[in-house]
Amino acid sequence: MKRELAIEFSRVTEAAALAGYKWLGRGDKNTADGAAVNAMRIMLNLVNIDGTIVIGEGEIDEAPMLYIGEKVGTGKGDVVDIAVDPIEGTRMTAMGQANALAVMAVGDKGCFLNAPDMYMEKLIVGPGAKGAIDLNLPLEENLRNIARALNKPLGELTVTVLAKPRHDAVIAQLQQLGVRVFAIPDGDVAASILTCMPDSEVDVLYGIGGAPEGVVSAAVIRALDGDMQGRLLARHHVKGDSEENRRIGENELARCKTMGIEAGKVLRLDEMARSDNVIFSATGITKGDLLDGITRKGNMATTETLLIRGKSRTIRRIQSIHYLDRKDPDVQQHIL
């Protein structure tokens, strides 16, 4: 991919973040997400790429825009696959809480795992513990191997886990081992990235979250020379074996079979992101551990964007001031 595409993709996530911010704290996560989707799609279609959405808002019959298989861009230029999460943290945006982002990752054709929208167990570490993880082993054994690779006592490890009921036993186990636990309500893409940032205390992310977010995380973890393993899990194996959960879970397993993916099998990083020739962009909506959130005063808004180019392993933080009434008219309707 041409490196100048990176700045174009930063504009895409900025527009999505600004659109989501319009609905900040208003209690309507679906409207916020819809606005971000629309703004992201408009901006993507201005970029000189022949792009296909491979991780998006759902199937064509479930989502009007940015659905899996949708073509975006001008149709000219590099042929790329795109993984998007227009708002990573729709609930946080609706409730005015921290760590909401607009996110996208772009790679060469065939770069990303085409994962169904289901659950994924994830274990993620930074470069210092690369090669030290194996989801086939018990969690405690993994943590001891990670601590050994990082040359630190087990009690000095910092592990981030989503604060969900399904993780209560995991959090208790980690605390019993003496590990420091950061329990976050949502936002495992941001938490994944923190494992690889030189100024972050986070050593490990572990837990069960969304598979689409897992693939986005894999792209940036590969770009930053970290390591990750994942395992697709059906809904009834995560949320309880009710009739409804089993129906959804069986459908997920059927989708996996159709797509040639084996649920329950450990997926290595290079199976989820097959190249480090990726560009990743994330713009903060609300202030968080990774990025500052948007501040707005009248017609002006300030954003912070994390832009990562895997080929050169370059990390940029971009602070931008936007005069909203000078934006593309099609975007204005979603941000003003």
Language model regions located:
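Acidic beta-strand-loop-alpha-helix segment within the catalytic core
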Residues: 108-183, 288-290, 304-334
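DPxDG-like acidic metal-binding loop motif
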Residues: 77-88, 92-111
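General beta-strand structural signal in soluble alpha/beta enzymes
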Residues: 53-57, 82-84, 93-95, 114-115, ...
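Short acidic, glycine/serine/threonine-rich loops at helix termini
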Residues: 65-67, 95-97, 115-118, 169-175, ...
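Glycine-rich ThDP/TPP pyrophosphate-binding loop and its adjacent helix/strand module
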Residues: 174-181, 188-202
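N-terminal subdomain of lithium-sensitive/metallo-dependent phosphomonoesterases centered on the IMPase/IPPase/PAP
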Residues: 1-83, 144, 148, 175, ...
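Oxyanion/phosphate-interacting regions
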Residues: 5, 194-336
